UniProtKB/Swiss-Prot annotation:
Keywords for the protein's UniProt record, in alphabetical order: Ribonucleoprotein, Ribosomal protein, RNA-binding, rRNA-binding
A cellular component term, taken from the record's GO annotations: cytosolic large ribosomal subunit
Single GO term (MF): 5S rRNA binding
Family: Belongs to the universal ribosomal protein uL18 family.
Domain of life, per lineage: Bacteria
Biased composition (Basic residues): 10-20
Signal peptide: none
Protein name: Large ribosomal subunit protein uL18
PANTHER family: 39S RIBOSOMAL PROTEIN L18, MITOCHONDRIAL (PTHR12899), LARGE RIBOSOMAL SUBUNIT PROTEIN UL18M (PTHR12899:SF3)
Ranges where the record places region Disordered: 1-25
Function, as annotated: This is one of the proteins that bind and probably mediate the attachment of the 5S RNA into the large ribosomal subunit, where it forms part of the central protuberance.
Protein source organism: Streptococcus pyogenes serotype M1
Length: 118
């Protein structure tokens, strides 16, 4: 019998492979995206120091309304505003092994519109 592939395990494998080649520095930190069934989370991370510089998610009080894609747009806007407030303008986008489509793309576009370059 053919077993059905576990999509999340495949995504995690893809993410590990990409993370081997992608790293954030203090000059150009990594914008990491995690997508769950109910929410979306974004962090700006300096991998050299191992520190999260800015973050936003659907758990924030400002984000609770709208569809998941609309929430992703608000999260992208919030994380960009918080990063720009800390003097970060350029980041490396880490899509977390997800396809660049839907909620991930909406978050990335909103972050670009609000001052992050990647």
């Amino acid at each position: 019998m053919i077993s059905k592939p576990d999509k999340n395990k495949i995504r995690q494998k893809r993410h590990r492979r990409v993370r081997g080649k992608l790293s954030g520095t203090a000059d150009r930190p990594r914008l990491n995206v995690f997508r769950s069934n109910t929410g979306i989370y974004a962090q700006v991370i300096d991998d050299v120091a191992g520190v999260t510089l800015a973050s936003a998610s659907t758990l924030d009080k400002d984000v609770s309304k709208g569809t998941k894609t609309e929430q992703a747009v608000v999260v992208g806007k919030l994380v960009a505003e918080r990063a720009v407030a800390k003097g970060i303008s350029e980041v490396v986008f880490d899509r977390g092994g997800y396809l660049y489509h839907g909620r991930v793309k909406a978050l990335a576009d909103a972050a670009r519109e609000n001052g992050l370059k990647f």
